[in-house]
């Protein structure tokens, strides 16, 4: 029985990892073993940060909405505003509210007035 060396498969696998590690510092971009470790760690960071990005944007939207609500009425807080929106039956998500607060303050103030009226 003849010996199978599988050199092409190994070379292709190595080349794939080295290609993914392109631009990394020093041996991390050329040495297969360190490149494998670097690519694995980079993939871990990428997966973690895709999840974190969603949390970070939601926190940013909440901060922007809170700031705009306090400009509208110093007594109103973010939680009271959201409660007023739900009582008024206004279903607008936080992303849209934050965008309105930044780019169209008049429209946001109209929504805030409706929320305040629903609370009273």
Curated annotation (Swiss-Prot):
The protein's name in its UniProt record: Large ribosomal subunit protein bL20
A Pfam entry, by short name: Ribosomal_L20
A single GO BP: ribosomal large subunit assembly
Biological role: Binds directly to 23S ribosomal RNA and is necessary for the in vitro assembly process of the 50S ribosomal subunit. It is not involved in the protein synthesizing functions of that subunit.
NCBIfam families: rplT_bact
Membrane found in the keyword field: no
GO molecular function terms attached to this record: rRNA binding; structural constituent of ribosome
Family annotation (CDD domains): Ribosomal_L20
Keyword match Ribosomal protein: yes
Gene: rplT
Matches recorded under HAMAP family: Ribosomal_bL20 (MF_00382)
Keywords: Ribonucleoprotein, Ribosomal protein, RNA-binding, rRNA-binding
Classification via InterPro entries: Ribosomal_bL20, RIBOSOMAL_L20_CS, Ribosomal_protein_bL20_C
GO cellular component annotations of the record: ribonucleoprotein complex; ribosome
Family under the similarity heading: Belongs to the bacterial ribosomal protein bL20 family.
């Amino acid at each position: 029985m003849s010996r199978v060396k599988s050199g092409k498969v190994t070379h292709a696998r190595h080349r794939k990892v080295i290609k993914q590690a392109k631009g990394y510092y020093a041996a991390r971009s050329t040495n297969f073993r360190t490149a494998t470790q670097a690519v694995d760690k980079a993939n871990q960071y990428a997966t973690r940060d895709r999840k974190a990005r969603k949390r970070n944007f939601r926190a940013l939207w909440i901060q922007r909405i809170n700031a705009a609500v306090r400009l509208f009425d110093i007594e109103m807080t973010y939680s009271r505003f959201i409660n007023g929106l739900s009582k008024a039956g206004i279903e607008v998500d936080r992303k849209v509210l934050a965008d309105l607060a930044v780019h169209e303050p008049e429209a946001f103030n109209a929504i805030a007035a409706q929320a305040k009226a629903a609370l009273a």
